[in-house]
Each structure stands twice: as structure tokens, then as C-alpha cells.
């Protein structure tokens, strides 16, 4: 029996697992990481070297404690959170803290590349001065971390030999090679998402503010990218020479780990960010970025992704700000705070007695001024109503995004599969089924991103010949939650008659708030 070591690097925890070729989670461990720090408003940085040390520690511990013979270990597969930038020198050592995906800094006062050549390039690309696509490029330019480094930390930029993601940073520590996966690159990088390679046009690198040679070569998620070096074996506790696969980003890996390989089965991830994804064999985009299109964990496919930036991060926020008593009570009972919150939540009826939440604690990608909102308060509402409204609000938003994906892809979602921490709760699974009015499945493991990376490794090594075979052998539905008719009826009305009208009603006020308070800054 072959086994795969999987490194799953999250925002709040780093996990390592051993999966076998049947998809069984033989052993797994999770170590917490220090949260990001913010030296200025909108910043979100992390100590990359500390992150790597914890990654090495948890991987070594899992291999030692798994009981799996070392000669049965077939490969190491990596999947991590996305859009974090780790600037490193020629030896792979960070030259400054990592800039995480939660970072919202912008660089003002930039101009798009000028000159006759650039004007011609824009015209050839069909980008007139007022073209929406050109405005989108300007926003990418403002938000590019490369441009920020060039303007405010030019010495750090000059010292950077390679800009890595969290995955490629870990890969280098394992193999002493610079490579990344085309399906790991999302967000503010100069990538051609249709071709799944670095962009062929030089003007794009000028807009993002980075030289092509500072970006690593890209491989597919089923390519053996390298082998474990002597130093990597010593630091990670894995056999030297073992093949290493850089899998897709964590969310695309979850889509594969859920076995959602047809265009009528969507996957929901209830993690720090909440996401709904659907696999597509064609490149489909949304004109105003209501959903994203990234390379999928299956080569030459794409993941259509609706994204709630601070999804189940909001549960941590709620516990910290409003429910410290729950943590104390959970410790006394020897359980998790979330379990107690979920029990309390079930005492609240569907619709939270009229309390409804818009979960934009992280602004929409196409509206940086958008804000979160809770409306409908009365004297009857308590903390448990707010908690249920958070869970319902995230699901409402994912349904809204799912409907947009259906419309633009021509697909029709008939089933949901759910991963992430939220999938462990029966109450959350049932609320999801009721709000979407769709059968909603829990898989045999909640660690779907790690399982997806293991599936990529199994296909890369030809242990399974193709993805349908791998999914059939490695993914199992454990439980299906069927919508409750009365609850679904209430939620359908709340979604269509109330939730979908909140953002259009509040959007003008978001602008006024920013204008009056100066936060966030209006471009």
C-alpha cells in the first residue's frame, strides 16, 4: 500500500497528513501559527521563517507518529493558502516578512506604462482609455505588492532573487529548487490564467511592477516537480529522494478532494475564507469579478470560485469579541467552543428572528468600499442569534455567488459537497442544505484540500491512471443532509426578498461613510 505525505499550509494552522492510496487519512496533526501582524493599517504580514519551522516540525512529527513504514511513503504533496508573497534571496531565505493574502495595502500615484510602444500594445489588446478592462488593470497596479515594494522598500526588492508563494517557499526548503504550480498562482501575479503560464506580454509585468526572471518556473499539479534533498530530508523528517508534487492552491485542491469533478457538483469550503467552487473544462470569466477563474487541481481545467474573504474567520472574531465565556465553558467540559455555539444556534429558528447579516468584513473584490452589515435587531436578540446570523449570512452570500457562476458557465448545480472546519457541524450542514435547497454532502474527511493534493500525487505517480479512477478510489460521501421543506421556504424568501436587496440599498452609504471618515481611502 502506497502512502502520501501531504503538507497543508493554512492561514491559522499548518497541518500534515498521511493518506493512503484509498484516500484514508492514516494520521494527521495540526500546529497553530502566529497570526499575521500589522505594522500599519491594511497590512497583514507573517514571519515566513517561523512558518517554515512549524511546517518542518509538524511534518516530521506526522511521519514519526504515523506508523507507516518509510518504504511505503510514495511522495510529498504540498497545498497551501494562496496569494501570499514570500520574497527570498538566492538561498531561499526571506529578505523581509511575507505579505499575506489578507493584506490590503495599495500604492497610489502610479501611472500605466506610457510611450508610443505601450500605447500601441494597449490598442492591440483592445484596451481604450475608458475600457473597463483597462480600469481593472489600473486597480491591479494599485494593489500589486511588487509595486509597493518598489516604491517603499526598494532595497528589499533589489535583494529579492525570487518572489515565491507559501507553497513554492516550502518546496524550495524540501528540494533546494525554485518552482511553483500554475494552479497555485492566483490574485495579484502576472499570470495568463487561460494559458496557465506566466503572461506572454511584457507590458503586464510593467503594470505589476516585477521582472519575469524574479518569478519561478511553473509546473502542472500532476508533474513531479522535484525530489527531497539531503537537507530537506533532515529538516522535514522525510526520505531523501522522495518525489515532491506542488499541488494546486488550497481551495482548488478542496474541489478535487470533494470529488467534485463534474460541472453539476459544487464544493463549499468553510475555512478562514468561505468559498464556493465549480469545475469547468473551459475558461469562463465574469466581467466585474463577481467570481474568479483559477487553474484547477486537474490540469487544463479551471475552478470557478465565489469568494467570501473573511468567511469562518468571522467565527473566530465572534468568539474573541462576544463569546469569551464559551471558551471558558468549553475548557471545563473538555470540548471545542464551536460545538457549544452550534448547540446554542439550534435554539434559534431559521431566519434568526429577522436578524440578517451581509458578510463583507473583507470588502468585495469589485467594490473596495463595501462593508459588513447586520440589520434587523430588536430587544429579543442575543449572542446566539448573532452567531446564527453569521452562519446564515455566509451561506446566503455563497448562494448568491453560486447563482452567478451557474448563469455564466451554463451549468446547473444539483449537489453540494462541503469541507473545512464548518463541515464538522451537523447544524451548519443542515443550514447550508436549507439555504441552497440542495442535497449537501459531508465527505469521509473534512481535510479536503489535503486529500485533493494526495489525489494529484496518486495521478502523478500513476498509482491511479486518471482522475475519475482516483476519485472513485479515494473519495467517499459519508453523510447527505436533505433540505427541510419549511426551512427552505423561509430561507428562499429571506434570500430573494431581503438578502439580495441589502447590498444595492447600502452601497451608496458605503461611499458616504468612506467620504466622511476617510476609511477606507477612496481611489
Language-model segments: which ranges?
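Glycine/Thr-rich phosphate-binding loops that ligate phosphate moieties of nucleotide
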Residues: 1-30, 37, 74-112, 155, ...
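Short acidic, glycine/proline-rich loop/turn micro-motifs
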Residues: 37-43
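Glycine-rich phosphate-binding/catalytic subdomain of phosphoryl-transfer
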Residues: 42, 57-332, 518-522
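A ubiquitous short alpha-helical element
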Residues: 43-46, 442
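Phosphate/oxyanion-binding active-site loops and adjacent basic polyanion-contact surfaces
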Residues: 48-55, 391
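Active-site-adjacent loop/helix segments that line or gate small-molecule/cofactor pockets in enzymes
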Residues: 48-51, 251, 271, 502, ...
Amino acid at each position: 500500500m502506497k502512502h502520501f505525505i501531504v503538507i497543508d499550509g493554512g492561514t491559522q494552522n499548518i497541518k500534515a497528513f498521511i493518506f493512503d492510496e484509498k484516500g484514508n487519512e492514516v494520521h494527521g496533526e495540526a500546529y497553530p501559527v502566529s497570526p499575521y501582524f500589522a505594522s500599519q493599517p491594511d497590512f497583514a504580514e507573517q514571519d515566513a521563517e517561523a512558518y517554515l519551522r512549524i511546517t518542518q516540525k509538524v511534518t516530521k512529527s506526522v511521519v514519526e507518529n504515523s506508523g507507516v513504514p518509510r518504504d511505503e511513503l510514495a511522495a510529498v504533496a504540498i497545498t497551501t493558502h494562496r496569494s501570499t508573497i514570500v520574497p527570498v534571496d538566492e538561498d531561499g531565505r526571506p529578505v523581509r516578512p511575507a505579505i499575506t493574502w489578507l493584506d490590503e495595502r495599495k500604492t497610489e500615484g502610479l501611472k500605466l506604462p506610457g510611450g508610443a510602444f505601450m500605447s500601441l500594445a494597449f490598442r492591440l489588446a483592445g484596451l481604450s482609455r475608458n475600457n473597463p478592462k483597462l480600469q481593472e488593470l489600473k486597480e491591479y497596479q494599485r494593489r500589486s505588492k511588487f509595486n509597493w515594494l518598489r516604491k517603499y522598500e526598494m532595497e528589499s526588492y533589489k535583494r529579492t532573487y525570487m518572489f515565491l508563494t507559501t507553497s513554492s517557499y516550502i518546496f524550495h526548503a524540501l528540494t533546494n529548487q525554485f518552482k511553483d504550480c500554475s494552479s497555485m498562482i492566483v490574485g495579484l501575479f502576472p499570470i495568463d490564467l487561460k494559458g496557465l503560464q506566466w503572461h506572454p506580454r511584457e507590458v503586464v509585468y510593467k503594470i505589476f511592477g516585477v521582472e519575469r526572471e524574479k518569478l519561478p518556473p511553473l509546473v502542472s499539479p500532476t508533474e513531479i516537480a522535484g525530489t527531497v534533498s539531503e537537507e530537506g530530508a533532515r529538516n522535514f523528517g522525510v526520505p531523501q529522494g522522495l518525489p515532491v508534487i506542488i499541488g494546486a492552491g488550497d481551495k482548488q485542491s478542496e474541489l478535487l478532494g470533494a470529488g467534485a469533478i463534474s460541472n453539476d457538483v459544487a464544493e463549499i469550503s468553510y475555512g478562514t475564507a468561505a468559498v464556493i467552487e465549480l469545475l469547468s473544462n473551459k475558461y469562463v470569466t465574469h466581467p466585474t469579478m463577481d467570481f474568479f477563474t483559477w487553474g484547477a487541481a486537474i490540469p487544463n481545467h479551471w475552478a470557478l470560485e465565489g469568494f467570501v474573504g473573511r468567511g469562518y474567520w468571522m467565527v473566530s472574531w465572534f468568539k474573541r469579541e462576544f463569546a469569551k465565556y464559551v471558551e471558558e465553558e468549553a475548557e471545563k467540559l473538555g470540548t471545542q467552543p464551536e460545538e457549544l455555539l452550534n448547540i446554542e444556534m439550534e435554539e434559534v429558528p431559521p431566519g434568526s428572528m429577522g436578524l440578517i447579516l451581509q458578510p463583507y468584513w473583507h470588502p468585495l473584490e469589485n467594490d473596495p468600499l463595501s462593508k459588513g452589515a447586520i440589520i434587523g435587531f430588536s430587544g429579543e436578540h442575543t449572542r446566539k442569534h448573532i452567531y446564527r446570523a453569521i452562519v446564515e449570512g455566509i451561506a446566503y452570500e455563497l448562494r448568491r455567488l453560486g447563482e452567478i457562476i451557474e448563469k455564466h458557465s451554463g451549468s446547473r448545480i444539483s449537489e453540494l459537497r462541503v469541507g473545512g472546519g464548518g463541515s464538522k457541524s451537523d447544524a451548519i450542514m443542515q443550514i447550508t442544505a436549507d439555504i441552497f435547497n440542495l442535497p449537501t454532502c459531508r465527505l469521509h474527511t473534512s481535510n479536503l484540500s489535503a486529500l485533493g493534493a494526495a489525489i494529484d500525487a496518486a495521478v502523478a505517480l500513476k498509482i491511479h491512471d486518471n482522475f475519475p479512477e482516483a476519485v472513485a478510489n479515494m473519495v467517499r460521501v459519508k453523510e447527505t443532509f436533505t433540505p427541510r421543506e419549511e426551512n427552505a421556504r423561509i430561507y428562499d424568501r429571506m434570500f430573494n426578498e431581503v438578502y439580495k436587496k441589502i447590498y444595492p440599498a447600502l452601497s451608496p452609504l458605503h461611499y458616504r461613510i468612506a467620504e466622511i471618515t476617510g476609511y477606507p481611502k477612496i481611489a
